[in-house]
Amino acid sequence: MTQDSVTIKLDQFLKWVGAVNTGGEAKLLIQDGEVLVNGAVETRRGRKLGVGDVVRVRGQSYEVAEDGEA
């Protein structure tokens, strides 16, 4: 993923990095305010993430990186 490329939705990103097993699990964590994006609680599962965004869930941090790396 590059700065000018397509973004990824928060719930999809959580599944992609293995933080959750299902979209339903992602939805519940996000709705319950257990997911932070760049240090702020995010309750929109459709929030679009771009390169450099940092997602924190269940004590783990994941940074959106270029070329499909997390």
Task: State where each predicted segment sits.
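A detector for short, charged/polar N-terminal pre-domain segments
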Residues: 1-6
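C-terminal structural segments of small proteins and small subunits
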Residues: 45-70
